[in-house]
Amino acid sequence: MATVAITPDQNAVFGEIFIAAPPARVFEAITDPQQMAKWWGQDGIYRLTECKADVRPGGKWSSIGVNADGTSFEVDGEYLEVDPPRLLVHTWNPSWTHPIKTVVRWELEPQSVHGLHPNGPRKAGTGTLLKVRQEGFAGEPAAAAGHAKGWKLVLGWAQAFVEKGETVDTREAISA
């Protein structure tokens, strides 16, 4: 299960989750546009319908999606740092909240896997501690709180996709 919190100054949201897969596999899931469109979302909340990514420093990325009420949204940005499979840093420019650009930092730390995992027995091998930190919410506590809720979902969706192949289409919808 993901843990997510907001810094005391409400400038940043940070979270982490363990994923029972090597960092290279997790990095692929968070950077490949086709995979992201499969796992990022849940009917009854929102879902991505289109993703584009030029995963290199200076490269651009964008996502288009639809909310549960049928309204669309967009988010885009630029990659600042790309160091597969351990680090990804990009700007985050949403169409739905504050006008401030934030920066998202993904860190992927290799972890040893031994014995049981909450999702069942696993072979000994490698896993990944996936950490995310989004900064730049100064003066926007409501935006920080909203993004904290979102990151908790996103980290869980990423884990379910990488570990079990769960997608938006196979995940149970949330009823409004």
Language-model segment annotations:
Residues 16, 89-152, 158, 171:
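Beta-strand/loop substructures that line and gate deep hydrophobic ligand-binding cavities in soluble
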Residues 26-27, 36, 61, 79, ...:
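Hydrophobic pocket/interface hotspot
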Residues 160-176:
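Short, highly charged C-terminal tails/helix-capping segments
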